[in-house]
Amino acid sequence: MAEQKIISLFDDDACTRYTILIASTIGEMREKKESIIDNTDPEIVKYLSQLLDVFRENFDTWAMAVVNRTGCALDPSTPKDQVEVKKFRQFSETEKSECFIKCLLLLILSLGNYSPYSRNLLYSIAEKLGLSSIVVYKAELITSSMLLDTFQTMESNQEMYELSGTRKMRRRIAMGLAGLAGGALIGLTGGLAAPFVAAGLGTLFAGLGLGTMIGATYLGTLITSAPMITALFGGFGAKMSMQQMGDVSKGLTDFEFIPLSVQSHLPVTIGISGWLGDYNEVDAAWKSLTVGDKSYYWGDIYALKFEVEALVDLGKSLSRILFSAGLGWVKGEVISRTILAPLAAALWPLSLLKVGNILGNSWRIAFNLSIKAGEALANALCVRAQGMRPVTLIGFSLGARTILECLLHLADRGETNLVENVIVMGAPMPTDAKLWLKMRCVVAGRFVNVYSASDYVLQLVYRVNSAQSTAAGLGPVSLDSNTLENVDVGDLVEGHLQYRWLVAKILKERLGYDNISDAEIQSLAVQEEKYESKQRTYYSQKEQEEEIEQEVLFDASSDTELAIQKKEDEVNEVRENKK
């Protein structure tokens, strides 16, 4: 096909070298997955045999599509544009590699999707070519901007608006679903897209002096196909911004993706909090990902909002355990019984169990809802709310549990090529290797378990409310490091609530994501100090008020009216100061 004979830039040697590089890298990706299986207990492999077969089938289908597409494009027998080939030969090796990576990105996108496997392939090849990951980040950014600009330009064209003249489509535009409507417009006027795409490619290959229309053909029919563009970006964010998520979130009173930084980038990141300090803090823990000149690495960033009332109630209960002076003894009691003398929760002192039960009610409610949210998240990903783009999931506390439940549901459905990276912190999840391997089968990239043995709050609530003795958020999961990264943050986290302010610090300093802003990490540390100070003051006043009220009740049994009045005045004074 003419559209497949698209690269007239590389000479024969380069075509052969790059073809081999693509094939060998894909082979290594498959071998890496297979090695996870080879190093696993045979009983577990037997348990996961059906899922592993699905993974192999999905991977091989993807690999064949990529090999066929790039193989045709890099066929040495394809006629070459000698002017462009001459330019290419004058490039340095770094420039040649950079040019190839950008062409490979366009070729992959021409398949109509940008899957986690595809993104892993791109970054792996870039690393082999000695390129910084920043080259790929910027190529993704420029390419997505190019497609978005094309989309918006056509959508604003009056002639195209008239073509969308049905009442239904105009009503959609009025409702704010311009992403869906605009997708239809592209289909009606696809031929007008090429000039705008060419301009974008000029930016992508800036400084290399290449003909932009050669690059334009790399995208194949993507530049003129409404279904492909709309599917790739999920209606340019329209699907993820819709509040009507009833079909995927049955059993939940609220379930919504809150956009933090959404500019139709190629990757998608979703942050999920496991408790909230207030009703308006759904996105607070994830704003740090949007700060800095490298924040585009995360792509389109969303915070998942679900069952806010339950998560706020849980946050209040956790704060009471951590910051109430009257419960200061809990920390030492839990640690001594966990580290010095590990015991089942049933053998713990009654006083400690009572504290656990105080927290337990709000925990159990939120815990059960987080499991439902995990299924709803899996539903949303399966219907491609994110489009055909790779997704990174990051969560702490019950947000981590939501993510892990989502992975289990994806595994049950055989969806092995939706999620790129997963990072869970303080996860209240059993350390059963069988479960974690099952989840690993649906994570294409990094899978990270961040834990703290010093997290005495999680120790308390998990032991009281679970039959399991150990949570993944308290210690490592016994799997090979190539399968799962276990990261110890015991020197940073001891109170569970701290994950809320330490997400950015952990991502940068412990997991190597250098796109996080140092200034933002420092700002979060200050915010944490202010929050803790405010909470301690609040519970100190609350305890003082409760203590005085108890004294009033005690003195009321005497006949000393003056003493009673004095105590009542003290209570009123405390209440007034609190206001």
Curated annotation (Swiss-Prot):
This protein's record includes keyword Cytoplasm: yes
GO process annotations (BP): vesicle-mediated transport
Keywords: Cytoplasm, Membrane, Nucleus, Transmembrane, Transmembrane helix
GO cellular component, one term: nuclear membrane
Record-annotated membrane-spanning stretches: 173-193, 196-216, 218-238
Pfam families: DUF726
UniProt cross-references to Gene3D superfamilies, sorted A to Z: alpha/beta hydrolase
Domain of life: Eukaryota
Record bears the keyword Nucleus: yes
Subcellular location: Cytoplasm; Nucleus membrane
Bilayer disposition of the protein: Multi-pass membrane protein
InterPro entries documented for this protein: AB_hydrolase_fold, DUF726
GO molecular function, one term: lipase activity
Family statement drawn from the similarity comment of this UniProt entry: Belongs to the TMCO4 family.
Protein name in the entry: Uncharacterized membrane protein C6F6.13c
